[in-house]
Amino acid sequence: FVNSIVNNNDVSKIPGLIKKIGEKKYLINPPEIVKDLNVLPRPPRHLVNMEGYFDIGQFHSSKSRSNRVLNIMCSRGCPEKCTFCTTPEVYGQTHRWRSTAHIMEEIKNDVRDFKIGELQFDDDTLTGNRKNLMSLCKELEKVGLPWCTPNGTKVNYHLKHQLDMYKSMAAAGCYQITLACESGVQRILDDVINKRLPADTIYPSIENAKKAGMLVHTFWILGFPGETYEEMQRTIKFAFNSGSDSFTFSILQPLAGSPIYRQVWRNNLWWDAKESYQNFRNSLIKVDGFSSPEEFERFIHETNIKANLLLKEKDPDKFRLKYGDRVSQSSLMKQT
């Protein structure tokens, strides 16, 4: 891009460039989807102040087992069509994996170079390909580092083999799995977000993960277009009774490029009739039962506090293992 500007070349030929014309944006030259992920080079982490990154300590998983974390992705793409998500738009709908050797080369080199103490896999669908995941787990077991899946995995992949899959993950060092449940109301899962997830598979999946010896964190989203206040309360109750060790209740964010984003514009669902800056903590669209974005944000804040303090009541030892000995309600909320 810089060379094109300096040399006065045609920038429209640069893949992925968005050029603004008037008040609208046009994607002039869509980038090609990388099919063979083994062609991707090792991320040049030596160009980053990794010690500064470790000192800040704001890793994807809020409570890590080490202060020297390596975030890594093994795959790209997602075959699902959830209406709130943009992963298929960014990475395509075909799920592709790097080879186990390619992944392990990155891990081993970075463990050596940066004295890594924990791995966090940021894949959208890490459990999507069980064969590849099991191959990876065999190698991770040799490395002996703790790891987790903070980006969330689909709940009902490989149900018949799920317990064995989770046991293999735990044996390879996975101390916590995050499950992307989103809602406990089947109407929302089917008709609003197209999740392709039977709600009655959520509890068994959580139970399988706990039987395998992993902590379970769950993701839930509230404030979908058309979701009623009563349905939100049903999801909260469903989550509280799920057996999950910890929770994140998020405010629906209408991500640009997602079907819900287009729905919000089409039906003018913004609180103030216009799109606002997204930071994943603010409420942008109208929500049933609430008169202002601030009121809904307070509701989500309080729900997260109640949800995550459940673990302290049920299992103080697990709570200390996850959050430490001196966590307060306010500091807990900064991490949810």
Task: Annotate each PLM feature.
Residues 30-31, 40, 133, 161-162, ...:
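Short aromatic-enriched loop/helix-cap "lid" or pocket-rim segments at secondary-structure transitions
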Residues 22-23, 60, 259-265, 269-336:
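Radical SAM enzyme core and accessory elements
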Residues 33-53, 262-280:
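Mobile, glycine-enriched helix-loop/loop "lid" segments at the mouths of ligand-binding/catalytic clefts
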Residues 217, 244-251, 309-316:
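Bilobed periplasmic-binding protein-like "clamshell/Venus-flytrap" ligand-binding domains
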Residues 165, 226-240:
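Catalytic cores of alpha/beta
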